[in-house]
Regions:
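Residue-level detector of short, conserved catalytic/binding motifs and their immediate flanks
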Residues: 27, 46, 158
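Conserved nucleotidyltransferase catalytic core and NTase-mimicking acidic/glycine-rich helix/loop elements
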Residues: 119-192
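A structural signal for short, well-ordered beta-strand segments and their strand-loop junctions
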Residues: 28-31, 100, 170-172, 176-177
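Short loop/turn segments at secondary-structure transitions that flank enzyme active sites
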Residues: 52-58, 94-97, 141, 166
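A basic- and aromatic-enriched beta-loop-alpha substructure that forms the phosphate/nucleotide-
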Residues: 61-138
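Catalytic metal-binding acidic patch
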Residues: 33-72, 77
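Helical scaffold of the NTase/Pol beta-like nucleotidyltransferase catalytic core
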Residues: 1-30
Length: 192
């Protein structure tokens, strides 16, 4: 298995290969999954996720096109990306996966202009209801799938706890922060 330091060199090479093979530009590439969450195991693969764009003519076509790039998965690599159009539509729908990608602590490649434009949209399209629904269902699925047997791998507990803690964070931190902003914007004397 490769180290993170080795992957910091190998991933940009893989992304350049994708750009050549698919005639796209990678705008944002990150690590997702257990490595981004801080609880990888020695046998964890690298979950590279990215957002890409095609040339303008691609978007002016009347034909439907595939909006994902997925490379074959092996013991080291799990690489997939979304077309910019798909990513923006999912952002509008408050898709938790894209929101998580934008918060990943491991960034392999980024277009600063893209990030400067998309980050402000996160708070605009963030839906507590959709996020809570997603994370509760994820927790339920993880618990039913991985925590019901006699022998449970410790890592599987993290996969069940993480979405529960995400719900708690959304309810306690995000909603409180929005509440404070609402009060402060309506009564600026509280800010003094």
């Amino acid at each position: 298995m490769q180290t993170q330091e080795e992957m910091n060199v190998l991933v940009p090479e893989k992304l350049a290969e994708i750009e050549r093979d698919y005639d796209v530009t990678v705008l944002w590439a990150i690590e997702s999954g257990s490595r981004a969450w801080g609880f990888e195991s020695p046998d964890s693969d690298f979950d590279v996720r990215f957002v890409y764009k095609h040339k303008q003519d691609f978007y002016l076509s009347l034909n439907d096109h595939r909006d994902v790039i997925e490379l074959p998965i092996d013991d080291t690599w799990d690489v997939s990306g979304w077309d910019l159009d798909k990513a923006l539509k999912l952002l509008y729908k408050s898709n938790p996966t894209l929101f998580e990608w934008l918060q990943s602590p491991i960034v392999y490649q980024q277009d600063s202009d893209f990030i400067d434009r998309i980050r402000p949209l996160v708070s605009q399209y963030f839906s507590e209801k959709k996020m809570l629904h997603h994370y509760l269902n994820t927790a339920r699925t993880q618990m039913n799938k991985y925590l019901s047997g006699d022998k449970v791998k410790p890592k599987k507990y993290f996969y069940a706890l993480r979405p529960i803690l995400a719900c708690r964070w959304i309810k306690n931190i995000i909603l409180f922060h929005r509440f404070c902003l609402m009060i402060w914007s309506k009564n600026s004397s509280l800010m003094k």
